[in-house]
Regions:
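Dynamic "connector" segments at or just before major functional cores
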Residues: 1-155
Length: 156
């Protein structure tokens, strides 16, 4: 094959990346994401593998951030188990499912509780034990907006 390629006799050579999915798949399983999303998705009876759709979109956002449409195109250059038959509208449905508001809004903060919150709570419960200690909290501040007087030299 290599000799034919060097001679210019190979009609088509295609490559697909294996690394991103291979590395992240193990983390996905070890953290319990696969099981938690699979359990929650099983309650809804989707006609496609919702867990694989969520995995694909998360993997895409980690390695090449973009829209769900971009994720659908991006996946063709990778080897990812279980995503070959997924269609764009199924990726949209998977993301919509994560944003579905829950009927039980107890413990609600500033925003309505969604399926995403259930996933986070169940993942935390898997790792939480008698000896767990919450010593570090990460906050996503990418969408925060501050307004006020002063602070003109803060970013310099």
């Amino acid at each position: 094959m290599l000799t034919a390629y060097e001679r210019g006799e190979a009609t088509k050579v295609a490559t697909r990346q294996l690394g991103p999915a291979l590395a992240f798949e193990r983390l996905w399983q070890q953290t319990g994401c696969r099981r938690v999303i699979g359990d929650l998705a099983g309650e809804r009876g989707f006609q496609f593998d919702l867990e694989r759709a969520v995995f694909l979109t998360v993997l895409h956002r980690l390695f090449d951030p973009g829209s769900d449409r971009a994720a659908e195109k991006w996946r063709h250059g990778l080897v990812i188990d279980g995503v070959g038959e997924l269609e764009l509208h199924q990726l949209y449905r998977a993301m919509g499912w994560l944003g579905d508001e829950l009927a039980d809004q107890s413990g609600r903060g500033l925003a309505p509780r969604t399926t995403k919150d259930l996933v986070e709570e169940r993942l935390f419960a898997l790792r939480n034990n008698l000896f767990s200690e919450l010593s570090l909290v990460f906050l996503d501040t990418t969408s925060l907006y501050f307004e006020g007087a002063g602070g003109h030299s803060l970013g310099q």
